[in-house]
Swiss-Prot record:
Described purpose of this protein according to its UniProt entry: Catalyzes the reversible retro-aldol cleavage of 4-hydroxy-2-ketoheptane-1,7-dioate (HKHD) to pyruvate and succinic semialdehyde.
GO terms of biological process kind: 4-hydroxyphenylacetate catabolic process; phenylacetate catabolic process
The protein's name in its UniProt record: 4-hydroxy-2-oxo-heptane-1,7-dioate aldolase
Sites marked Transition state stabilizer: 70
Record GO terms (molecular function): 4-hydroxy-2-ketopimelate aldolase activity; metal ion binding
Top-rank EC class of the record's enzyme: lyase
EC number: 4.1.2.52
Taxonomic lineage of the native organism: Bacteria, Pseudomonadati, Pseudomonadota, Gammaproteobacteria, Enterobacterales
Binding annotation for substrate: 147, 174-175
Matching PANTHER family: 2-KETO-3-DEOXY-L-RHAMNONATE ALDOLASE, PHOSPHOENOLPYRUVATE CARBOXYLASE FAMILY PROTEIN
Keywords: Aromatic hydrocarbons catabolism, Lyase, Metal-binding
Gene transcribed to yield this protein: hpcH
Chain residues that bind a divalent metal cation: 149, 175
Length: 265
């Protein structure tokens, strides 16, 4: 077993991603052929559940793009189900401290290293027990990315980085800017300073920094600073803005939209 996304991060190869929020296997497959290194299937802010995640994993599987799945919460039960349907790389939201980071890691590991329940006869992940010795190989194939999104998490970042099994740390600029008192303005200088400092700390600890940023100039800046997994857009935004722009060229019904150059998404 291997995890190409995890291998790329370990090798220090920057990975460019796209956020998926349409909850559609059809659009997921369409975007899997677009050339992104990874695609984030969002279960926190998009109305995904285990069955919809499963169909998107199946749709992406034939393509080079690697799936990353975000559960709605740092919940071992939900994580167990996502792993069983085939997720190998998880982006765990709102991790505040080392204890919560350890919980996320343990949820992805079979005992004695963790608390993942054994049900491989029922699991797509093991090809229904057709993967030889799956239970002894699976732990090493897991990639755990934790999200830091508050001032408390930033304060605890050194301890989070010390947690064995955390492969990367994703900085959530939207929630972080809100927590810092600059909601809706992730480009505020205080927020940007915090993000840049966090990227440097994460790299110095030998982990992979990640972020989502639709502003092209900022996304490139984060890559220059050493971010290794950077999502540069969102499927819902691409569809909405593209449709609005097309309508505006032919009708008088142009919709007022958010300036994406000032937004995370």
């Amino acid at each position: 077993m291997n995890n190409a996304f995890k291998d790329a991060l370990k090798a220090g190869r920057p990975q460019i991603g796209l956020w998926l929020g349409l909850c559609s296997s059809y659009s997921a497959e369409l975007l899997a052929g677009a050339g992104f290194d990874w695609l984030l299937i969002d279960g926190e802010h998009a109305p995904n559940n285990v069955p919809t995640v499963l169909t998107q994993l199946q749709a992406i599987a034939p393509y080079p793009s690697q799936p990353v799945v975000r559960p709605s919460w740092n919940d071992p039960v939900q994580i167990k189900q996502l792993l069983d349907v085939g997720a190998q790389t998880l982006l765990v939201p709102m991790v505040q401290n080392a204890e919560e980071a350890r919980l996320a890691v343990r949820a992805t590991r079979y005992p004695p290293a963790g608390i993942r329940g054994v049900g491989s006869a029922l699991a797509r992940a093991s090809r229904w027990n057709r993967v030889p010795d799956y239970i002894h190989q699976a732990n090493d194939a897991m990639c755990v990315l934790v999200q830091i999104e508050t001032r408390e998490a930033l304060k605890n970042l050194p301890q989070i980085l010390d947690v064995d099994g955390v492969d990367g740390v994703f900085i959530g600029p939207a929630d972080l800017s809100a927590d810092m008192g600059h909601g809706g303005n992730p480009q505020h200088p205080e927020v940007q300073a915090a993000i840049e400092d966090a990227i440097q700390q994460i790299r110095q600890a030998g982990k992979a920094p990640g972020i989502l940023m639709a502003n092209e100039q900022l996304a490139k800046r984060y890559l220059e600073l050493g971010a290794l997994f950077v999502a540069v857009g969102v499927d819902t935004t691409l569809l909405a803005r593209g449709a609005e722009a097309l309508a505006a060229r032919f009708t008088h019904n142009a919709t007022t939209t958010t300036d994406n150059n000032k937004s995370v998404y």
